[in-house]
């Protein structure tokens, strides 16, 4: 196995810059401080943040809107009087307790309306709900008891757990828990050398499970929460997120809660303050203009051509951070770029899937649960959040036409499975069919015991992510999501490239979690910034890069497993 394929996230970051072979390379000058960042999602804004704080002159080019997939945006023609337009979004934002890089950045962004930080405006989440269909008991999950658990909640949770576990074949549950233990006690060598190359489905022995077990133990983690397919994604990538979630839920490694949500629509609470702070540091933003091609000269990027409705020009800088999503980065790999760094051809092998959202604006408050709701049995892998309960503003008084009191935001993780109303996958449905289908799938879980939760009259309007375009009977997606598959770590790039002044940032770049997350995007933005610092000869301190939580109690098991892996032996518990 190559050294590249065995690099871990901590190796991949570094501050070293690979030199290209066979090409003359111009050396940087001591005053080379100009940086162009292409893309203003979390990765690009993070790189701009870290570099601007260290005295670099940063210009950010963004083809659509600041914030990328993480932004919120106004619903067109939804306001009346002095109110704002209703909030829409690509998908609701949730910051799990095991995130480290993103919370650190949020603590360094001043809010716009007080003397606190953006992080101070995050609302703790201590529980979530597995909503079941066909009369099965919903399963509330509590990460910790202090301050949030009522006697009624504990009674319901205990009864639901007992019913669910009675329905699960004990042998299958033991197998699943054993497989989790195998992963959590596996060495880094085995994770990257063995578990990277088998699917999560095969790793947990999903083919031996009942359909009920697969829904609860496999699909609920993969499709519903991270838009990954258990039969395609590697055991290493899914296992990494699974163990991180376990450590957060048990408070072994957490920022204080199992997760947090914002106290207002995302851009108002986070993206707008972030952009304002970056502007105060001298960052310049050019919106509506995207990169078309990099130009190469003497082994370095000499310019990037950017275009927009009224713009078509070359932009020169000393350093370039490409922070666009992988499907956009692939378009920038011209023959000249690949000649300068042939390893970047691997980007063509990376894949994307669809995970987009729809918001239902309701006439009545509908706090279904004071945390995310995972519709385990929904074929489209739905997860919802009733957001008005967490926002520090009056939705009815401040937004829309004065009748909307709730924003029920729903993420759709599976666009390929047939629905329950039209029998078609989401990617084949018209927007109104998607809205009807999503409501039906939620009602199948929320109203399966006879109670009415989502009556027809309560829905004032709905808004589908505008990245989904339905034209001439065909759906397209302008903002798909990077997904892992077995062996994809080997073809994921590092933040530093063999082109000395080109750096990559985005959730497809190697990082700790190995999944499409805001945390991973933030980490790669830091890694790209550190690459610029190293290559420019800057004496500024590097951006902090955190290591994943590694329980000391498991260290001896992992050392033993590393020795067994080097000798070609299986994990000591890998007998099931």
Predicted regions and their residues:
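Extreme N-terminal leader/targeting segments of oxidoreductases
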Residues: 1-35, 53-54, 552-576
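Core beta-strand elements of the Rossmann-like FAD/NAD(P) dinucleotide-binding domain
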Residues: 31, 310-319
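C-terminal segments that line or cap access tunnels to active or ligand-binding sites in enzymes
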Residues: 251-262, 305, 317-319, 324-492, ...
């Amino acid at each position: 196995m190559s050294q590249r394929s065995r690099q871990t996230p901590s190796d991949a970051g570094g501050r070293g810059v690979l030199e290209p072979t066979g090409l003359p390379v111009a050396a940087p000058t001591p005053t080379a401080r100009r940086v162009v960042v292409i893309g203003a999602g979390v990765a690009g804004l993070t790189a701009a943040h870290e570099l601007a704080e260290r005295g670099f002159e940063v210009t950010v080019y963004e083809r659509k809107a600041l914030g990328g997939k993480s932004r919120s945006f106004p619903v067109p023609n939804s306001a009346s009087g002095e109110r704002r337009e209703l909030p829409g979004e690509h998908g609701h934002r949730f910051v799990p307790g095991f995130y480290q890089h993103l919370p650190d950045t949020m603590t360094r962004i001043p809010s716009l309306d007080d003397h606190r930080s953006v992080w101070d405006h995050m609302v703790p989440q201590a529980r979530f709900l597995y909503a079941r269909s066909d009369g099965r008991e919903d399963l509330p999950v509590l990460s910790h008891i202090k301050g949030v658990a009522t006697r009624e909640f504990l009674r319901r949770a205990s009864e639901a757990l007992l019913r669910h576990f009675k329905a699960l074949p004990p042998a299958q549950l033991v197998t699943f828990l054993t497989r989790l233990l195998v992963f959590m006690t596996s060495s880094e060598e085995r994770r990257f050398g063995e578990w990277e190359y088998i699917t999560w489905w095969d790793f947990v022995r999903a083919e031996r499970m009942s359909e009920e077990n697969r829904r609860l133990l496999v699909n609920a983690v993969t499709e519903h929460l991270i838009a990954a397919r258990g039969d395609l994604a590697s055991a290493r990538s899914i296992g990494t997120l699974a163990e991180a979630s376990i450590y957060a839920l048990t408070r072994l490694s957490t920022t204080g809660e199992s997760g947090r949500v914002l106290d207002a629509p995302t851009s108002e609470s986070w993206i707008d303050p972030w952009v304002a702070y970056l502007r105060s540091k001298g960052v310049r933003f050019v919106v509506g203009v995207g990169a078309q091609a990099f130009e190469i000269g003497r082994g370095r990027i000499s310019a990037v051509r950017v275009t927009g409705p009224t713009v078509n020009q070359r932009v020169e800088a000393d350093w370039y951070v490409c922070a666009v999503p992988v499907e956009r980065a692939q378009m920038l790999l011209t023959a000249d770029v690949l000649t300068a760094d042939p390893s970047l051809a691997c980007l063509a092998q990376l894949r994307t899937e669809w995970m987009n959202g729809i918001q239902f604006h309701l006439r009545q408050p509908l706090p279904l649960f004071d945390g995310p709701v995972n519709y385990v049995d929904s074929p489209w892998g739905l997860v919802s959040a009733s957001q008005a309960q967490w926002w520090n503003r009056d939705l009815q008084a401040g937004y829309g036409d004065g009748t909307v009191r709730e924003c029920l935001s729903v993420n759709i993780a599976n666009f390929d499975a047939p629905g329950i109303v039209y029998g078609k996958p989401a990617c084949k449905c018209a927007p109104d069919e998607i809205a009807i289908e999503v409501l039906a799938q939620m009602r199948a879980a929320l109203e399966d015991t006879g109670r009415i939760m989502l009556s027809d009259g309560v829905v004032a309007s709905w808004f589908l992510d505008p990245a989904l375009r339905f034209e001439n009977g065909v759906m397209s997606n302008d903002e798909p999501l990077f997904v892992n598959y077995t062996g994809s770590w080997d073809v994921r790039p590092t933040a530093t490239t063999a082109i000395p002044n080109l750096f990559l940032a985005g959730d497809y770049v190697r990082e700790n979690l190995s999944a499409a997350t805001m945390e991973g995007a933030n980490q790669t933005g830091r890694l790209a910034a550190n690459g610029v610092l190293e290559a420019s000869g800057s004496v500024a301190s590097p951006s902090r890069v955190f290591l994943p939580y590694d329980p000391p109690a498991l260290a001896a098991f992992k050392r033993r497993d590393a020795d067994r892996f080097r000798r070609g032996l299986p994990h000591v518990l890998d007998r099931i």
